[in-house]
A protein has these predicted regions:
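Catalytic Walker B motif of ABC-type/P-loop ATPase nucleotide-binding domains
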Residues: 159-163
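Conserved ABC ATPase "signature" region
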Residues: 84, 103, 107-130
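Conserved ABC transporter NBD signature motif
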Residues: 63-74, 78-79
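ABC ATPase "signature
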Residues: 218-219
Length: 274
């Protein structure tokens, strides 16, 4: 059931309605093992409902879905053993340290040597320096990284990142993006739900656009770009965005400051040539 030929997630003709209002209207997609699959849609598109069905928290009205080869309706216990769900609300205990949070989850899952498990995850997610601090002192980015580390205890083959960067500042978002990429590099299958276009573009191997309860497009970034008309060559003056300015100022030891200066200089030169 869990051979490489079987998709990590398989969804077929999935439907769900609330009081005769269709939320999911025949959703179909597959997620390949070890890949990052982005489910892109605005608020109300049906992303959360779909995640709740895949994580066995909600039953579909019609259609089928499987995770790691297990049917979400008839093999719910096996599905729950195969996945971990984390998102915009970090499920951490603020009165405990980072290490204590990790060890607590390892003990609750009856795993051997919780201390070693915690140390390995602290190192993997660059949390060693913050390991002995109470989580109440953590920044948003640190909390999110700890939450994702906690979700990997027990090594679930599939992790669902549900709106993982909502409410984070630009630097913390980039930190979470890096964690997502590392998960896939280690063989974990990642289902990412997001409403941020840049997030899907940066992370996903494939992107499905969910709109009004239906998948209206599904493909790689290159395939989706082919849906647009042929590109036209235009000469424009590009000014740095506020995010460019922010990251240039607070980047690692100011290494991006020359980039900001070059961007401004290039823009000025382009204006002079025009």
């Amino acid at each position: 059931m869990t051979t490489p030929h079987v998709p990590a997630i398989h969804v077929q003709s999935l439907e769900k309605a609330y009081k005769n209002v269709g939320v999911l209207r025949g959703v179909d997609f597959d997620v390949a093992r070890g890949s990052i699959f982005a489910l892109l849609g605005s608020n109300g598109a049906g992303k959360t409902t779909l995640v709740n069905i895949l994580s066995t928290l909600l039953k579909a009205d019609a259609g089928t879905a499987s995770v790691n080869g297990f049917d979400v309706a008839t093999q719910a216990a096996d599905v729950r053993e195969s996945i971990s769900l984390t998102g915009q609300f970090a499920a951490v205990d603020e009165i405990l340290t980072g290490r204590e949070n990790l060890m607590l989850i390892a003990r609750l899952r009856h795993l051997k040597d919780p201390g070693t498990i915690a140390n390995d995850l602290l190192e993997r997610f660059a949390l060693t320096d913050a390991a002995e601090r109470k989580v109440s002192t953590y920044s948003g980015g640190l909390r999110r990284r700890l939450d994702i580390a906690m979700s990997l205890i027990g090594y679930p083959p599939v992790i669902i990142l549900d709106e993982p960067t909502t409410g984070l500042d630009p630097q913390a978002r980039i930190e979470v993006w890096q964690v997502g990429k590392e998960l896939a590099e280690h063989g974990t299958t990642v289902l990412l739900t997001t409403q941020y276009l840049d997030e899907a573009e940066q992370l996903a191997d494939r992107i499905a656009i969910l709109h009004q309860g239906r998948i209206i497009e599904n493909g790689t970034l290159a395939e989706l770009k082919q849906l647009l008309p042929p590109a036209k060559i235009e000469y424009v003056e590009k000014q740095p965005t506020l995010e460019d300015v922010f990251l240039a100022i607070v980047g690692d030891e100011g290494k991006d400051l020359p980039t900001l200066a070059m961007t401004a200089a290039s823009a000025q030169k382009g204006e002079e040539q025009r």
